[in-house]
Amino acid sequence: PRMVDYVVPTGVRIAEAERVRLGAYLASGTEVLREGFVSYNAGTLGPATVEGCLYSGVTVGEGAVLQHDSSVVSNALSNGDRPALHVGASTVLGVNSTLMELSLGDNCLLGPNLLIEPDTTLYFADDDRLAPASTIAGEDGWSIVHEPGNVEPVARKVADTTSTGSSGQSNQGSRSSRRAK
């Protein structure tokens, strides 16, 4: 059933009542836009923008943005339970991106048109290596995007803007052996 049939949360904007299920939790300041969906046992822990889908067992932090058609999915276990997943504060999931069975920390970016699962191979450009996405599960400050010339999604540590001496420049080079043929 719809959440708003039973309770109307204060300080929350819901564009389409049918898109928020009873049992969802929405913190004050949250916006669920027309294409957004929040299932039962899912929600926001601070003001957030949801234009994608939060499935059961998923929470997002303050300032998180789920852009159009993005999803965070916690698949059901054989006993029917869903492991809890969390997307950190100020994390952005790009248009048509999906994060399955993996948590992300604060200040992360998942670029558009990506499907990231724990066993998805990522290219870590900063140290020129391949590794599964599970190696950064729950960590803060990652950008994962498609980059021209790379087969795998490219993961880069986001520059810490709070520390002094950071040049703010990113290393956009890629190994020639990793380039798409």
Language-model-detected regions and their locations in the chain:
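A generic structural signal for short, non-catalytic loop/turn and secondary-structure boundary residues
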Residues: 7, 65, 137-139
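Sequence-level motif detector for i,i+2 pairs with an aromatic at +2
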Residues: 9, 15, 139-141
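C-terminal segments of enzyme domains that contribute to small-molecule binding surfaces
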Residues: 79-84, 89-92, 98, 115-181
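A mid-sequence, solvent-exposed acidic-amphipathic segment
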Residues: 4-7, 17-19
